[in-house]
Swiss-Prot record:
Protein name: Envelope glycoprotein gp160
Region (V5) residue spans: 468-478, 470-478
Post-translational modification: Highly glycosylated by host. The high number of glycan on the protein is reffered to as 'glycan shield' because it contributes to hide protein sequence from adaptive immune system. Palmitoylation of the transmembrane protein and of Env polyprotein (prior to its proteolytic cleavage) is essential for their association with host cell membrane lipid rafts. Palmitoylation is therefore required for envelope trafficking to classical lipid rafts, but not for viral replication.
Alphabetized GO MF terms: structural molecule activity
Keyword hit for Iron: no
V2, as annotated region: 153-196
Originating gene: env
Residues making up the signal peptide according to the UniProt record: 1-33
Positions of region (Fusion peptide): 524-544
Region (V3): 296-333
Species: Human immunodeficiency virus type 1 group O (isolate MVP5180)
Superkingdom assignment: Viruses
Residues passing through the membrane, by range: 698-718
Motif (YXXL motif): 725-728
Length: 876
């Protein structure tokens, strides 16, 4: 029993040794390296932005055309070598209905119209009663319908002399007149101009030329424009083929209603855009893939008369007839190819059915407008400065029966067999502005023939009722919201801001300066990554984008920088034309915004201690909650920088605050370290070059003490005098000679009697000064000697303490070494015993197996003998 207990005790001791060894090894094996936040500059990361865009155009500086004048003052010249960089493997969301570029273009075109068609006079409306009769004409046909809508009105106006009136005549459209309920009127022919009391009229004179030229919208420095190149893209949703440009393509700011003129064509299929194309009262924007030529003509000439109304005047068409004058100067017409137009409507219907996923046969009707203001119920556009109003009833008079996704079985339209279609138009002076909703009177039509060639590139439609998948559906032309036209031109653009940096976790950290251990670590190289430019590696993973800067990088960066530099040089070259107008201020804001963004980003990097570094390691420990479901390997191998930046967008401000706090602490540590470094220059105090400075300080101290002593003496004298004492005069010491011996003296003093002696210095100022100096010198000497003695004793104590500390440290190290040696020996013994036990067990098992095999073998070997013995027994 005693032997068994000893064996168990020995086994328990070995087990405890094994447990301790495992406890020491498990933390080492389970250790995972800490991740730290690292700032990367120049990574392909962006976010949507709304900066102030500026325009570029190829304006003719010598032209007097109003659009050229406006473009030369508001826009910079275009870049002769524009660059477009495709982004591989990059997808991004676009939304034309929330694109601020549309709003900015809308404001710009308003500014263009305000400047190009700027009125020269401002006057109140002709609020007078007029007697109007139908305009007599012998013409018949389509154009006569427009003439029949006009009235010949006569009215009285006030001349410069207020007490004198004069009768005038002018032509007005019926839609611009309101009948007056006057009992004295004959046959109810008294009229007045509509809204004459509520509208301020701006009259444009003289007539100006107005021909739109293409305008390019450009992003300022630090921003870029994404362009979607998907063929089936409709302005909303995810785009898979994206490229980066600095400026858009040339956009012609043509203003029109119902039809889109001179716009951007769809590349393959007809493009249909809308917030909800199956609802009624929602605009459906159609962009054709083939242009349809339309030519508008106004024939004839006319004279213009001035009608004075007091100190002002109003210009109108005269009724004087001559060989070359005609009241038909306000009548025009437009021609187009009916076959091409009919095919465009049919393809629009088929494309619409594909978008709404229609499976059954339906009937689609294109009908005339439902009415409204003349600008909405007609095709309204500007041609050579004249305002055209065209009736499009003939263009939208088609019915497509039994239509499917592939085609329509029957088409019902106009019965005319003529290949070219014609729509009547009229020119008007009284125009309701699409910009501010106010009415304006412009000068009468200019004389001569007017011809405008335009391309129909789209149309704006509305459903009468919500989409009916089993019955008829009617589409009508609408207009009025010019933003729909700008959307067809800007649907595939969006502006983004290039982020200067991003944050990601790495295993490298910034060396922390500790005031107790001021040793600086050498920064590790890490990934050694330099990026291929701002957006050239946008589609690559974070790890793949981290490659060395190559020649391709220089070319990409050089291209982007050169393009921005070209634009800025163009702005600088045109500064004399960019006046301090709205556009001049906008150009200045665009440049200042880019500069402010750059300064703000550089300031943030400076505060983080990352100035001039592409990769900036920090001492901020990465929180695993920031990464979410991603680990370190999946971040660098599976995500792009854009995806990663969107993932940490909600916590980026927290990370930035942590980096800022860590940098502040780092600066405090540096300050404390520098203060500690000052003690290292203690031995410089004994430098011979500083002795003169020490002597000067000593002289100043002694002089100050003497001065204080003199002041105290003077104050003491003043005090004594006030108390009634008289100060003694200064006495000069004189030698004292021995007096002659008097009779009766025995000369008991002895010695040399004839030697002179000095008596003690009588009390006075010099004696007091000498005493003070002697006292100060002795005090200084004793003070310095005591200080040196104290320092020596302190050094002795420090040395003794350091020696004792060293002895203790050595003893502790020896003890630790002995303990470690003991535990290592125990581990070695435990391992040896374990191996011995395993060997003995294996040997026992091996011996048992061998013995069993031997017995089995012997059994097989004894089989013949047993058979022989059995046979012998049987035979016996």
């Amino acid at each position: 029993m005693t032997v068994t207990m000893k064996v168990m005790k020995k086994n328990n001791r070995k087990s405890w040794s094994l447990y301790i060894a495992m406890a020491l090894l498990i933390p080492c094996l389970s250790y995972s390296k800490q991740l730290y936040a690292t700032v990367y500059s120049g990574v392909p990361v962006w976010e949507e932005a709304a900066p102030v865009l500026f325009c570029a155009s190829d304006a003719n500086l010598t032209s007097t055309e109003q659009h050229n004048i406006w473009a030369s003052q508001a826009c910079v010249p275009t870049d002769p070598n524009p660059h477009e960089f495709p982004l591989g493997n990059v997808t991004d969301n676009f939304d034309i209905w929330k694109n601020y570029m549309v709003d900015q273009m809308h404001e710009d075109i308003i500014s263009l119209w305000e400047q190009s068609l700027k009125p020269c006079e401002k006057m109140t409306f002709l609020c007078v009663q007029m007697n109007c009769v139908d305009l007599q004409t012998n013409k018949t046909g389509l154009l006569n319908e427009t003439i029949n809508e006009m009235r010949n009105c006569s009215f009285n106006v006030t001349t410069v002399l207020t007490d004198k009136k004069e009768q005038k005549q002018a032509l007005f459209y019926v839609s611009d007149l309101s009948k007056v309920n006057d009992s004295n009127a004959v046959n109810g022919t008294t009229y007045m101009l509509t809204n004459c009391n509520s509208t301020i009229i701006k009259q444009a004179c003289p007539k100006v030329s107005f021909e739109p030229i293409p305008i390019h919208y450009c992003a300022p420095t630090g921003y870029a424009i994404f362009k979607c190149n998907d063929t089936d893209f409709n302005g909303t949703g995810l785009c898979h083929n994206i490229s980066v440009v600095t400026c858009t393509h040339g956009i012609k700011p043509t203003v029109s209603t119902q039809l889109i003129l001179n716009g951007t064509l769809s590349r393959e299929k007809i493009r249909i855009m809308g917030k909800n194309i199956t609802e009624s009262a929602k605009n459906i924007i159609v962009t054709l893939n083939t242009p349809i030529n339309m030519t508008c003509i106004r024939e004839g000439i006319a004279e213009v008369q001035d009608i004075y109304t007091g100190p002002m005047r109003w210009r109108s068409m005269t009724l004087k007839r001559s060989n070359n004058t005609s009241p038909r100067s306000r009548v025009a017409y437009c021609t187009y190819n009916k076959t091409v137009w009919e095919n465009a409507l049919q393809q629009t219907a088929i494309r619409y059915l594909n978008l709404v996923n229609q499976t059954e046969n339906v009937t689609i009707i294109f009908s005339r407008t439902s009415g409204g203001d003349a600008e909405v119920s007609h095709l309204h556009f500007n041609c050579h400065g004249e305002f055209f109003y065209c009736n499009t009833s003939g263009m939208f008079n088609y019915t497509f029966i039994n239509c499917t996704k592939s085609g329509c079985q029957e088409i019902k339209g106009s019965n005319e067999t003529n290949k070219n279609g014609t729509i009547p138009c009229k020119l008007r002076q009284l125009v309701r502005s699409w910009m501010k909703g106010e009415s304006r009177i412009y000068a009468p039509p200019i004389p001569g023939n007017l011809t405008c060639h335009s391309n129909i590139t789209g149309m704006i439609l509305q459903l009468d009722q919500p989409w009916n998948s089993t019955g008829e559906n009617t589409l009508r032309p609408v207009g009025g919201d010019m933003k729909d036209i700008w959307r067809t031109k800007l649907y595939n653009y969006k502006v983004v801001q290039i982020k200067p940096f991003s944050v990601a976790p790495t295993k490298m950290s910034r060396p922390i300066i500790n005031i107790h251990t001021p040793h600086r670590e050498k920064r590790a190289v890490g990934l050694g990554m330099l990026f291929l430019g701002v957006l050239s590696a946008a589609g690559s993973t974070m790890g793949a984008a981290a490659t060395a800067l190559t020649v391709r990088t220089h070319s990409v960066l050089k291209g982007i920088v050169q393009q921005q530099d070209n634009l800025l040089r163009a702005i600088q070259a045109q500064q004399h034309l960019l006046r301090l107008s709205v556009w001049g201020i906008r150009q200045l804001r665009a440049r200042l915004q880019a500069l402010e963004t750059l300064i703000q980003n550089q300031q943030r990097l400076n505060l983080w201690g990352c100035k001039g570094k592409l990769i900036c390691y920090t001492s901020v420990k990465w929180n695993t909650s920031w990464s979410g479901r991603y680990n370190d390997d999946s971040i660098w191998d599976n995500l792009t920088w854009q995806q990663w930046d969107q993932h940490i967008n909600n916590v980026s401000s927290i990370i930035y605050d942590e980096i800022q706090a860590a940098q502040d602490q780092q600066e405090k540590n540096v300050k404390a370290l520098l203060e500690l470094d000052e003690w290292a220059s203690l031995w410089n105090w004994f430098d011979i070059t500083k002795w003169l400075w020490y002597i000067k300080i000593a002289i100043i101290i002694v002089g100050a003490l003497i001065g204080i002593r003199v002041i105290m003496i003077i104050l003491n004298l003043v005090k004594n005098i006030r108390q009634g004492y008289q100060p003694l005069s200064l006495q000069i010491p004189v030698p004292h000679r021995q007096e002659a011996e008097t009779p009766g003296r025995t000369g008991e003093e002895g010695g040399e009697g004839d030697r002179p002696k000095w008596t003690a210095l009588p009390p006075g100022f010099l004696q007091q000064l000498y005493t003070d100096l002697r006292t100060i010198i002795l005090w200084t000497y004793h003070l310095l000697s005591n200080l040196i003695s104290g320092i020596r004793r302190l050094i002795d104590y420090l040395g003794l303490g350091l020696w004792i500390l060293g002895q203790k440290t050595i003893e502790a190290c020896r003890l630790c070494g002995a303990v470690m040696q003991y535990w290592l020996q125990e581990l070695k013994n435990s391992a040896t015993n374990l191996l011995d036990t395993i060997a003995v067990s294996v040997a026992n098992w091996t011996d048992g197996i061998i013995l069993g095999l031997q017995r089995i073998g012997q059994g097989f070997l004894h089989i013949p003998r047993r058979i022989r013995q059995g046979a012998e027994r049987i035979l016996v």
